[in-house]
Amino acid sequence: WIMGHMVNAIYQIDEFVNLGANSIETDVSFDDNANPEYTYHGIPCDCGRSCLKWENYNDFLKGLRSATTPGNSKYQSKLILVVFDLKTGSLYDNQASEAGKKLAKNLLKHYWNNGNNGGRAYIVLSIPDLNHYPLIKGFTDTLKQEGHPELLEKVGYDFSGNDAIGDVAKAYKKAGVSGHVWQSDGITNCLLRGLSRVKDAVANRDSGKGYINKVYYWTVDKRATTRDALDAGVDGVMTDYPDVIADVMNEAAYKNKVRLATYEDSPWVTFKK
């Protein structure tokens, strides 16, 4: 999965997919009442990027639905996975469950079209703080209450705070999650970060006994870092430059080892070599 980073304006969906992304990451900010409000990152953000692009969250969801609904004039068949980077740092811990409920209602209405031929992309809810694990239950309970438990098949989870792998496992246990887990690791492109935790996550994924199904590394903008990440065995790389990742995947060392994921590749099933 080549994951376009910080895709917060509707026009950027096409821009990143056309550069080679089959997945995007979108920031979600919340208002004081835990309503998802804008797709907005703000300052500071990655070096070389504008931090200030935004849409109203519901408008973005409608644009995303168009891009991921077969038959729509804006349909992009390659776009199969969306990571919502939930900026829950602005919320009190006791609002996490409420944020999950409201997120579920927004997605159900504006993205899944109330279960009636909505967008088809898989969704990852990425949460920066382990203490906000109740967001997951708020989300899953709401989809069930609204009569659409089947949509949970399209939803996965990520804790993005670079916490110890054992602590992340405990948070999932509390949230009642087993499966559909992506584990992120990374840092802004302005700084360097080693791959030791990525390797730990890959080992957990491949052990058959861990909680992780997929691993992604962010933010990867250079060819050398891309090669290191692919060599470490990641499933996804998040990038500001999808074309750089695509180029490296076409290099002789990789072109017979890795390929771009398609809609038929489940993002929840650990790939067996």
Curated annotation (Swiss-Prot):
EC number: 4.6.1.-
Catalytic reaction annotation: an N-(acyl)-sphingosylphosphocholine = an N-(acyl)-sphingosyl-1,3-cyclic phosphate + choline; an N-(acyl)-sphingosylphosphoethanolamine = an N-(acyl)-sphingosyl-1,3-cyclic phosphate + ethanolamine; a 1-acyl-sn-glycero-3-phosphocholine = a 1-acyl-sn-glycero-2,3-cyclic phosphate + choline; a 1-acyl-sn-glycero-3-phosphoethanolamine = a 1-acyl-sn-glycero-2,3-cyclic phosphate + ethanolamine
One cellular component term from this protein's GO annotations in UniProt: extracellular region
SUPFAM superfamilies per record: PLC-like phosphodiesterases
Pfam families hit by this protein: GDPD_2
Name of the protein described by the UniProt record: Dermonecrotic toxin LhSicTox-alphaIA2bvi
Tissue: Expressed by the venom gland.
Residues the record lists as binding Mg(2+): 25, 27, 85
CC cofactor: Mg(2+)
Family stated for the protein in its record: Belongs to the arthropod phospholipase D family. Class II subfamily.
Keyword Coiled coil: no
Disulphide linkage map: 45-51, 47-190
Function noted in UniProt: Dermonecrotic toxins cleave the phosphodiester linkage between the phosphate and headgroup of certain phospholipids (sphingolipid and lysolipid substrates), forming an alcohol (often choline) and a cyclic phosphate. This toxin acts on sphingomyelin (SM). It may also act on ceramide phosphoethanolamine (CPE), lysophosphatidylcholine (LPC) and lysophosphatidylethanolamine (LPE), but not on lysophosphatidylserine (LPS), and lysophosphatidylglycerol (LPG). It acts by transphosphatidylation, releasing exclusively cyclic phosphate products as second products.
Cellular localisation: Secreted
One Gene Ontology biological process: killing of cells of another organism
GO molecular function annotation: lyase activity; metal ion binding; phosphoric diester hydrolase activity; toxin activity
Annotated catalytic residues: 5, 41 (nucleophile)
